[in-house]
Every structure is written in structure tokens, then in C-alpha cells.
């Protein structure tokens, strides 16, 4: 890497790296470093009246106070932080004091990984600490961390820019307290859910991510191409149709937690790559699934937070079962005053116009109803609420309602104004299913790019017979948002999808060389801030000369300085 592309701190750290190696200390050792304790456990288990406990710990050095022959550092391991007391004569018991005077005081930097062996004690200030007897260099940090400081409950030098935090999650996790806890809770959400399903005897399975037909949901898929088979494939938008095939095959209850992909917009609650859980249980219906779902979510909340109440933004949400149940058409009537029962597509289109909604000709009856609910109803349900009995046009994979053939046995759970999960009494009539798929194809011909494609193999599977079944899908990212009180999906994804990182545009060296500039001077000119030839057009030759010659001297590049006249000629040649 060109030295001019580095910051001053990065240059110093790389020099320290080389100096460590010159001393015979490998800054990235290969050998295992054995630890026997974590910071949090050391503090929790410490007793003043016991024999001092010998410990071996490892982590990042996050702060350092040097006071001559004695120093304090703060060591951060995977569970927390602990103070370490280091004295010259304890880590350098012999004549050679280089490990303290040179390595620790001068060549180590904040962010470096080190190992500490020593004993636990309480300082005169009452802080449980480790008295170091041996220090080992484990990994040198050659790029400075943004060290966040905390004092009296106040945060200083915070690393809080959302784009930087999401793009460099590794830094966010290292320096911001509480971020790691979100992802620890996420793991607990998964464990609790699996425990709930497994205790009922349901089996976790895996189904294809690359699919010949993108089915199981109304969404735009990502496409790819299989070179060996020379066929187009889709990244799955849902695992539903494959899981139902397993019910046909004889499994009574199956579930899958996995990635889905939808080629759609990104916002505070949507990421194109997301994690979904889907479960299907034979001989059940959507009424059973509502009770099953509310008990599951109550259990997860208790396991993760120790309570059924969670604060999300300004709202306190209580996940204690049972949850309120409201029909979709009932919700629309309550919030708009319009009863859509029995209305055809044109009548509903007129209602949309009266409500001043933006609609288009590609929207069928189901899509129009969905738009009305989304605009006027969805955001009002803060506490967990089951919205039930969706119109048949909205639910091509759902069984018709036993009491009203215009509706389906479907529910969505709304929490904090957003859909959390979606469930059905699954359609298992193959003739009805084929007709529903054909209706979807008509919507596709009208221009609805989210309409489902006919999956003939799935229909064939149903023809062999599928028992009455209920299925439910839940967005794991949104569930984690609720369980951790987060308002954006990016906060619960380690690495959310980001737009390409902005790069400062730079002209090639050849463009500068056309002005008569020697190639070795191009990085110097760009270091001075003139990344493109056009940036030099209005500059004062004297100032430009001072800038680039100053960089030559500062970085000891030993280049032959141009004259002010040379610089003036370069600038004159710019058209």
C-alpha cells in the first residue's frame, strides 16, 4: 500500500509492527492462547477473603493510563471489560525491562489484542482488577478504533453515524456498548423458538434456496442462472411449497428457519435478504395456530427478557397471551366507515377513489383491499392483534372459510403497527389450488409482477393427498426487533444490505502526466487534495507548490521538488 494512502496514526502503527518483529516478537502469533476466565465471571465470583485467583484472560486494550513504572489498562473480552494493573517489575522480573518500557508503553496501541496472566484483587478504590504477571501480544491493530469514552453516564467521542455503524459492524460491536447484547438476544430468540417446536415433536428441515419456480408468496424474486443445466433459477421468496410437500410425504410437523430473498425496496422494516421461520402441522386449522402462535411468542419474550412486556419506541407492548382477534373487513369498516362485504372489484375501486388513494389498473380486488387495510388500519394495531378472515383474492394458498366462501381461513399478527406473522388453514384441494394459480396468472397478465406462478409439481403433490394442515410464517428479523426494542431492521442484522460505498473520484496517473507531471508526483498531488486534474485549475501555483513539497518532506519521500514555475506550467496546460 502507498504510504500516502495511510493516516499518520496508521503509519505509526505499521512502524510499531515492524519494530515488534525486529525485536523477535511476532505480532500475529499462530499458537493457541489458553484462557480460563471471562471478565464478567471474574467480577461475579470474586471474594475478598479467598486466596487470590490465578487467571488467564485475553481481549482488546481499550484504554491505558501510564504512571511511570505502573499502569492501568481496560481489557475488553467477549463478555465485558475489566481493569488490569501492570507494573514494570512484575511483567519484567529480570534485568530486561523491554516488555514494559518499549513494548507495552510505546509499541502497543489501543485496540491491540493482548493476553494477560495474573491474579485477581481489589484496588484501594474498590475496583475488582487483575494484577498482571505476564503480558503476551496476540494481534496488532494497525487501524485506530474510534475509542468511545464513558464517564458518569455520559458518552464521549461516540461512534454513532448509522451508515458507518452498519457498514463497519465489526467496529460498532467493538466500541459501542449494548450492540452485542442485541445479537445475543437474537440468538436467544432462535433457541427459544426451536425449543418450543422441538418440545412439541416437530422436526427442523431444510429445503432448496435455489428454486425453478419462485412460489409461496407474492413478491419479486432475484434471478440467477445455472450454467451446467443452462436454466434460470430463482432465489427463494418463501419455503412454503416445499414444506407442504413434506406434509404430503407423511411428516406431521415440520419447520424451517432460513434465508429468503425478495428483490424489492429497503426501508426501516425491510431488507432484501431476510430470515423467516415457517412451520406446518398436519390435522390443525388456523384457530389452533392462533393459540399456538401466541403461546410461542409469550414464551420467547419471557425467555429473552424475563418479562412479557417490551418497550419499543414510545410503546409498551405486552406479549402475554391471549391476543385480540379482529376480522380484516371488520377492521376496514371500523377505520374507514366502508363495509366491503360482498363488493366486487369495481365497487372497491370506487371506495379507494373516495378515500383519495393512489391505485392503478394492475390492482385486482385482493390488492385493492390490501392497500386499504395497509393505509388506514395496519398502523393502528400496537398491541398484538390477530387480523383474520382475509378475502379469497388475497390468499391463493389458503383454504376457503368454512362459513363464507368469499373469505379464507387466514390470519396475520399485527404488532406495533406492522405485520409480524402470516398463517392459514392450508389449501389442500388440488383442483381449487390449480384454479387459484390460474387466477394469479391472469393478474400477472394484467401487469402484477408479484402474482404467483403456477407450480405444477406442487399441484401434483396435492393430488396425491395432503391432510388438513395449518401453516405459519414469521419474520425473524422483525420478531428480534420487537424482542430487543429496536425500531429499524438494520439494528438487528449483523450486516444489512447497503448501497455501494461512496468513493472519492480520482483521475488516472496518465491524465496528470499529460500536463508534464512525473508519475511519482501523482500520489503526492492527490494526497494534497487534488484528486482530479480539474481540481488544480484555479489553484495558486505558490500554494500548490508549498502543499506538495510539504508532503514530500513530511513523509520523507525524497522526491526532487519541482519549481514554482514548473507548477505554474502544469496549471496553464489545464483546459
Curated annotation (Swiss-Prot):
SUPFAM superfamilies: Class II aaRS and biotin synthetases, Nucleic acid-binding proteins. Binds 3 Mg(2+) ions per subunit. Its cofactor is Mg(2+). It catalyses: tRNA(Lys) + L-lysine + ATP = L-lysyl-tRNA(Lys) + AMP + diphosphate. Its EC number is 6.1.1.6. It is an enzyme of class 6 (ligase). CDD domains: LysRS_core, LysRS_N. Gene3D superfamilies: Bira Bifunctional Protein, Domain 2 (3.30.930.10), Nucleic acid-binding proteins (2.40.50.140). Keywords: Aminoacyl-tRNA synthetase, ATP-binding, Cytoplasm, Ligase, Magnesium, Metal-binding, Nucleotide-binding, Protein biosynthesis. One of its GO terms (molecular function) is ATP binding. InterPro entries: Aa-tRNA-synt_II, aa-tRNA-synth_II, aa-tRNA-synth_II/BPL/LPL, DUF4332, Lys-tRNA-ligase_II, Lys-tRNA-ligase_II_N, Lys-tRNA-synth_II_C, NA-bd_OB-fold. It is found in: Cytoplasm. The keyword Magnesium applies. One of its GO terms (cellular component) is cytosol. Mg(2+) 2 binds at residue 419. Mg(2+) 1 binds at residues 412, 419. One of its GO terms (biological process) is lysyl-tRNA aminoacylation. It comes from the Bacteria. Belongs to the class-II aminoacyl-tRNA synthetase family. Homodimer. This is Lysine--tRNA ligase. It comes from Bacteroides fragilis (strain ATCC 25285 / DSM 2151 / CCUG 4856 / JCM 11019 / LMG 10263 / NCTC 9343 / Onslow / VPI 2553 / EN-2).
Amino acid at each position: 500500500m502507498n504510504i500516502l494512502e495511510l493516516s499518520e496514526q496508521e503509519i505509526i502503527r505499521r512502524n510499531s509492527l515492524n519494530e515488534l518483529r525486529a525485536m523477535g516478537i511476532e505480532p500475529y502469533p499462530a499458537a493457541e492462547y489458553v484462557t480460563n476466565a471471562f471478565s464478567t465471571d471474574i467480577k461475579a465470583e470474586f471474594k475478598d477473603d479467598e486466596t487470590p485467583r490465578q487467571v488467564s484472560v485475553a481481549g482488546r486494550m481499550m484504554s491505558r493510563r501510564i504512571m511511570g513504572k505502573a499502569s492501568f489498562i481496560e481489557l475488553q473480552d467477549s463478555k465485558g471489560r475489566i481493569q488490569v494493573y501492570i507494573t514494570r517489575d512484575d511483567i519484567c522480573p529480570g534485568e530486561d525491562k523491554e516488555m514494559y518500557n518499549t513494548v507495552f508503553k510505546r509499541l502497543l496501541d489501543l485496540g491491540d489484542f493482548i493476553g494477560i496472566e495474573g491474579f485477581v484483587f481489589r484496588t484501594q478504590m474498590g475496583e475488582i482488577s487483575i494484577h498482571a504477571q505476564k503480558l503476551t501480544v496476540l494481534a496488532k491493530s494497525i487501524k485506530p478504533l474510534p475509542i468511545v469514552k464513558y464517564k458518569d453516564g455520559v458518552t464521549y467521542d461516540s461512534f454513532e453515524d448509522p451508515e458507518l455503524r452498519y457498514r463497519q459492524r465489526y467496529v460498532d460491536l467493538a466500541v459501542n456498548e449494548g450492540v452485542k447484547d442485541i445479537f445475543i438476544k437474537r440468538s436467544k430468540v432462535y433457541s427459544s423458538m426451536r425449543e418450543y417446536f422441538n418440545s412439541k415433536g416437530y422436526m427442523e428441515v431444510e429445503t432448496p434456496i435455489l428454486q425453478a419456480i419462485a412460489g409461496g408468496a407474492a413478491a419479486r424474486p432475484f434471478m440467477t442462472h445455472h450454467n451446467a443445466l443452462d436454466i434460470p433459477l430463482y432465489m427463494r421468496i418463501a419455503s412454503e411449497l416445499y414444506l407442504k410437500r413434506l406434509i404430503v410425504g407423511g411428516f406431521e410437523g415440520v419447520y424451517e428457519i432460513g434465508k429468503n430473498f425478495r428483490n424489492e425496496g429497503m426501508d426501516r422494516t425491510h431488507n432484501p435478504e431476510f430470515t423467516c421461520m415457517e412451520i406446518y402441522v398436519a390435522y390443525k386449522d388456523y384457530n389452533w395456530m392462533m393459540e399456538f402462535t401466541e403461546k410461542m411468542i409469550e414464551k420467547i419474550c419471557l425467555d429473552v427478557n424475563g418479562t412479557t412486556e417490551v418497550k419499543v419506541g414510545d410503546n409498551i407492548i405486552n406479549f402475554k397471551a391471549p391476543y385480540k382477534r379482529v376480522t380484516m373487513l371488520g377492521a376496514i369498516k371500523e377505520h374507514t366507515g366502508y363495509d366491503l362485504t360482498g363488493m366486487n372489484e369495481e365497487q372497491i375501486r370506487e371506495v379507494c377513489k373516495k378515500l383519495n388513494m393512489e391505485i392503478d389498473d394492475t390492482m385486482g380486488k385482493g390488492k385493492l383491499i390490501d392497500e386499504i387495510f395497509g393505509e388506514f388500519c395496519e398502523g393502528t394495531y400496537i398491541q398484538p392483534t390477530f387480523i383474520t378472515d382475509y378475502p379469497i383474492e388475497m390468499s391463493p394458498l389458503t383454504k376457503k372459510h368454512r362459513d363464507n366462501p368469499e373469505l379464507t381461513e387466514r390470519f396475520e399478527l399485527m404488532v406495533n403497527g406492522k405485520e409480524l406473522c402470516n398463517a392459514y388453514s392450508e389449501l389442500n384441494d388440488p383442483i381449487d389450488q390449480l384454479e387459484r394459480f390460474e387466477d394469479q396468472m391472469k393478474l400477472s397478465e394484467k401487469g402484477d409482477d408479484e402474482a404467483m406462478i403456477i407450480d405444477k409439481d406442487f399441484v401434483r403433490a396435492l393430488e396425491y393427498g395432503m391432510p388438513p394442515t395449518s401453516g405459519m410464517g414469521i419474520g425473524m428479523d422483525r420478531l428480534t426487533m420487537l424482542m430487543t426494542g429496536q425500531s429499524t431492521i438494520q439494528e438487528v442484522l449483523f450486516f444489512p444490505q447497503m448501497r455501494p460505498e461512496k468513493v472519492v473520484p480520482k483521475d488516472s496517473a496518465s491524465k496528470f502526466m499529460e500536463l508534464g507531471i512525473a508519475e511519482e508526483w501523482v500520489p503526492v498531488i492527490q494526497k494534497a487534495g487534488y484528486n482530479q486534474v480539474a481540481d488544480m485549475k484555479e489553484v495558486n501555483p505558490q500554494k500548490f507548490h508549498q502543499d506538495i513539497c510539504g508532503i514530500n518532506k513530511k513523509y520523507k519521500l525524497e522526491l526532487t521538488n519541482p519549481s514554482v514555475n514548473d507548477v505554474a506550467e502544469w496549471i496553464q496546460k489545464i483546459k
